């Protein structure tokens, strides 16, 4: 519909049937604070550009589509261009609004713009105007009469009852005085162009704004601008469209910058570019570590509420405002600071009598958001900081008492959802089952993660070592190995771990909680992996076999370690004696022997890296090769250090001689003790008489006590009558798998370990080491009572039972006692009638191997025992002893 010229001259600019879509002046508001403009003072081109942007929008409001617009980047002087703009508007007969508006009203507006007489605060916004002009005091402002009633200056549209659209200003701001003699009626628009265009585009699904880079279309122009930021280089498509003259039919919002300087501010640290210096300063706070965590809204509101009324035309700015505000065009944020901080509060004060009324409507107060990298919430108990209050509340539950307990196991939790998730582990769901390996899971997400193993997908790769992982969380845990980060620390011993699960499993060592139990032998474990490894021994799943000696193993690493035996030399060599070892841990244990024997500086210097792993006790000469064993050994000295014998008055160190010295002097046997079931039977430093120390771990069957849980577990194997480990060659059964492995080596024909002195071969390296001590004459284990030395510690223990008279092994059939378990085993064959050893010549069976060997000498004629006087030889040692009595004339 066309509009008459007399209507325009009369000031009726907003008729209900308007064909042309106008923008509200509010959409042109660009609010900045003084701090923002100070950052842009050095860039005078930016000031000129913002003037050009404002004038161009006003020309779009009051001109026609075929009106040529002046260039935005070619205006040397702002005031000259403003004056020139008011006179360069052409006349077009095809437009009904040209003559009246362009000649009179628009020329008046341009004249007021150029002369600086227009009250911009009533049109644009005081925050934007003061920050735009720099110094608020340097702008000449007209005086608005306080005596005039606001109702006298209302527009005809407002009086006629027309409902305006988005309000641009209050009705008191309807009069904009250019001078006391000259007034200009403002434009009160019914709807803004952005609102109309948005409504039309939604109804018609039109997307007129198209990106020239990728061809994507948008219904709103600001969406196109936000999309263009994704393209790393080049100028905005809006500028290219305007340069080609293609934007006259559609309105594009203006960007706060020219195409040449769209992203002219570059960060020196990371190379990121920004369109304004204030955004660059916000971004640089990430590199400097500066964190503005305190919300300024409360302090701003308090400061503004107490501030006195300002004079008309003066600027209202809070002194507490310290954060810049990005420019807005058409109500859209052109760019947001990297820290995620919201815009400052504006128009917080209410209008006072005599004050100039506010232009824009007050907006609700919004707090600034905390930066994403800031941690402003601190726990009062442990001092740990968090970025949000929710995370702090979640962390504080860890300090509180755990309330949720699982009904199926002793596990407790501090969150109900964790307890619910744990309870599902006791009832696995059949729906979440892997079709490849038939493994079931409690959650579908766990099934999806597991299926990635079968697919072989490892998208997450470590930059340090190149190792790939299935999940990003696994990669983060792996990267802690390179960085050395161990955030999870044990409160009992101070040991740190990379993963929380490792800390949980470690804490079970202090608490003694072993939730994983073997259903076959009832043995408990504190880790599920240990239980899985243990159950493989019951199943006898030995998939890895040696190609040379046909020996089988459960794990692949055991086979790799075994293959090193067939090599000529071991990988690790001792620098002191030249002995080779397959494992480094075995070499470290061997080096501890040299360190105990020779404490010279030369030995310590040559093995400096290994001596750190050897821990020596200051009270005795015992030096275990691990700190854990040293800590267990030092507990003996902490509780019991020495004792005194009443009959003889002799003092002794019970850590070195743990056998009860009083029973030796008095001749009291352990069977005569008041509590024979608690008497010790060996020289282990962890098992003492109850008069010296009270162990904490007790056996329920024999009521026997032990100091360490491992000793109790080893003792409980005696009560287990079942022998699940059977030999396939001779059907012999064993209680432990290691005994079966040692036994199976006797059936193999190869003996890989050969003695270099006598050429004798052995199945195990430990047997060879014991045998070599015979040639060297080394007997490190010495009896403290008679001074007799032995090669091994087991021989010393058996010998010391002669002095104490201890016979802990009792036959259940006849009650006979024995000092050694092997003697009890041989004795039990009398009751059972078992004779496992058979002569290969005559088929005679024997209960003991020694008797079999003696019998075989009859068939072979071997006589190894010869008399030293007459040279006569005998097949048995007893026959030689009887013959020697002839020469000595001794009577039996």
Curated annotation (Swiss-Prot):
Which residue spans traverse the membrane? none
A single Gene Ontology biological process assigned to it is: regulation of DNA-templated transcription
Q: Where is this region: Disordered?
A: 66-97, 134-203, 297-370
UniProt subcellular location: Nucleus
Which stretches does the record call C2H2-type zinc fingers? 209-231, 265-287, 377-399, 404-426, 432-454, 460-482, 488-510, 516-538, 544-566, 572-594, 697-719, 725-747, 753-775, 781-803, 809-831, 837-859, 865-887
Keyword annotations for this protein, in alphabetical order, are: DNA-binding, Isopeptide bond, Metal-binding, Nucleus, Repeat, Ubl conjugation, Zinc, Zinc-finger
Annotated KRAB domain ranges read 23-101
Q: Which family does it belong to?
A: Belongs to the krueppel C2H2-type zinc-finger protein family.
Q: What is known of its domains?
A: The C2H2-type zinc fingers are involved in discrete Cajal bodies localization, interaction with LSM11 and the SLBP/RNA complex and histone pre-mRNA processing.
Function of the protein? Involved in histone 3'-end pre-mRNA processing by associating with U7 snRNP and interacting with SLBP/pre-mRNA complex. Increases histone 3'-end pre-mRNA processing but has no effect on U7 snRNP levels, when overexpressed. Required for cell cycle progression from G1 to S phases.
> What protein name does the entry list?
Zinc finger protein 473 homolog
Q: Which species does this protein come from?
A: Mus musculus (Mouse)
The opening ranks of the lineage are:
Eukaryota, Metazoa, Chordata, Craniata, Vertebrata
């Amino acid at each position: 519909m066309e509009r008459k010229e007399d209507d325009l001259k009369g000031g009726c600019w907003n008729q209900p049937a308007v064909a042309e879509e106008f923008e509200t002046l509010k959409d042109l508001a660009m609010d900045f604070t003084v701090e923002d403009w100070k950052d842009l003072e050095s860039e005078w081109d930016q000031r000129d550009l913002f003037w050009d942007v404002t004038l161009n929008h006003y020309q779009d409001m009051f001109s026609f589509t075929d009106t040529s617009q002046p260039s935005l980047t070619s205006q040397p002087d702002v005031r000259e261009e403003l004056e020139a703009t008011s006179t360069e508007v052409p006349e077009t007969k095809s437009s009904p609004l040209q003559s009246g508006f362009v000649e009179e009203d628009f020329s008046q507006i341009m004249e007021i713009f150029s002369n600086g007489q227009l009250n911009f605060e009533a049109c644009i916004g005081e925050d934007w105007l003061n920050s735009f002009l720099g110094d608020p005091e340097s702008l000449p402002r007209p005086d608005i009469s306080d005596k005039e009633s606001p109702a006298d200056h209302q527009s005809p549209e407002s009086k006629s009852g027309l409902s305006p659209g988005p309000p641009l200003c209050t009705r008191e701001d309807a009069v904009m005085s250019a001078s006391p003699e000259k007034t200009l009626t403002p434009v009160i628009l019914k709807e803004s162009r952005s609102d109309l265009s948005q409504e039309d585009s939604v109804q018609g699904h039109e997307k007129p704004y198209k990106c020239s880079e990728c061809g994507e279309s948008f219904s709103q122009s600001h969406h196109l601008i936000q999309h263009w930021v994704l393209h790393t280089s080049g100028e905005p498509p809006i500028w290219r469209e305007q340069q080609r003259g293609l934007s006259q039919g559609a309105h594009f919002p203006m960007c706060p910058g020219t195409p040449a300087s769209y992203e002219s501010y570059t960060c020196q640290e990371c190379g990121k570019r920004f369109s304004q210096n204030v955004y660059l300063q916000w971004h640089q706070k990430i590199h400097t570590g500066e964190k503005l965590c305190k919300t300024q809204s409360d302090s701003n509101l308090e400061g503004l509420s107490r501030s006195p009324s300002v004079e008309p035309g003066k600027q209202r700015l809070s002194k507490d405002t310290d954060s810049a505000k990005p420019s807005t065009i058409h109500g859209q944020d052109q760019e947001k600071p990297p820290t995620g901080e919201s815009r400052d509060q504006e128009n917080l004060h209410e209008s006072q009598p005599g004050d100039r009324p506010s232009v824009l409507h007050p907006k609700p107060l919004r707090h600034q958001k905390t930066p994403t990298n800031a941690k402003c919430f601190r726990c009062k108990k442990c001092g740990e900081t968090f970025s949000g209050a929710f995370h702090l509340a979640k962390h504080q539950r860890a300090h509180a008492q755990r309330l949720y307990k699982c009904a199926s196991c002793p596990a407790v939790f501090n969150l109900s959802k964790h307890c619910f998730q744990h309870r599902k582990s006791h009832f696995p769901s059949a729906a979440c089952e892997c079709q490849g390996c038939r493994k079931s899971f409690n959650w579908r997400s766990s099934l999806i993660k597991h299926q990635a193993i079968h697919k072989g997908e490892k998208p997450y790769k470590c930059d340090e070592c190149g190792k790939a992982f299935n999940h990003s969380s696994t990669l983060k845990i792996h990267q802690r190995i390179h960085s050395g980060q161990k955030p999870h620390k044990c409160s009992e011993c101070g040991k740190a771990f990379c993963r929380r699960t490792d800390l949980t499993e470690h804490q079970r060592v202090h608490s003694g909680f072993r939730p994983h139990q073997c259903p076959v032998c009832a043995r408990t474990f504190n880790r599920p992996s240990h239980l899985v490894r243990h159950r493989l021994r019951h199943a006898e799943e030995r998939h890895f076999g040696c190609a040379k000696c046909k020996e089988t193993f459960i794990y692949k690493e055991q086979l790799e370690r075994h293959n090193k035996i067939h090599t000529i030399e071991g990988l690790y060599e001792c620098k002191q004696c030249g002995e080779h070892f397959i494992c480094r841990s075995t070499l470290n244990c061997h080096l501890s022997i040299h360190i105990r024997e020779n404490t010279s500086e030369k030995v310590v210097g040559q093995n400096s890296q290994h001596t750190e792993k050897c821990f020596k006790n200051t009270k005795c000469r015992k030096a275990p090769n691990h700190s854990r064993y040293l800590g267990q050994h030092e507990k003996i000295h902490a509780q019991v250090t020495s004792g005194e014998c009443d009959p003889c008055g002799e003092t002794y160190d019970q850590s070195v001689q743990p056998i009860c010295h009083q029973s030796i002097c008095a001749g009291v046997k352990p069977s005569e003790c008041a509590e024979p079931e608690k008497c010790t039977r060996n020289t282990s430093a962890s098992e003492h008489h109850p008069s010296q120390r009270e162990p904490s771990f007790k056996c329920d069957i024999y009521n026997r006590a032990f100091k360490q849980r491992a000793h109790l577990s080893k003792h409980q194997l005696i009560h287990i009558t079942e022998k699940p480990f059977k030999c396939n060659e001779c059907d012999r059964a064993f209680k432990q798998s290691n005994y079966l492995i040692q036994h199976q080596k006797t059936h193999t024909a190869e003996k890989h370990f050969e003695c270099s002195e006598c050429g004798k071969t052995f199945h195990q390296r430990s047997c060879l080491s014991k045998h070599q001590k015979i040639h060297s004459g080394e007997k490190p284990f010495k009896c403290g009572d008679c001074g007799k030395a032995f090669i091994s510690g087991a021989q010393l223990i058996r010998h010391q039972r002669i002095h104490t008279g201890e016979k802990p092994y009792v036959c259940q059939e006849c009650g006979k006692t024995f000092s050694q378990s092997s003697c009890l085993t041989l004795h039990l064959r009398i009751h059972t009638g078992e004779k496992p050893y058979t002569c290969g010549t005559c088929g005679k069976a024997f209960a003991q191997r020694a008797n079999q060997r003696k019998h075989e000498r009859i068939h072979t004629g071997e006589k190894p025992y010869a008399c030293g006087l007459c040279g006569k030889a005998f097949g048995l040692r007893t026959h030689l002893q009887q013959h020697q009595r002839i020469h000595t004339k001794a009577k039996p």
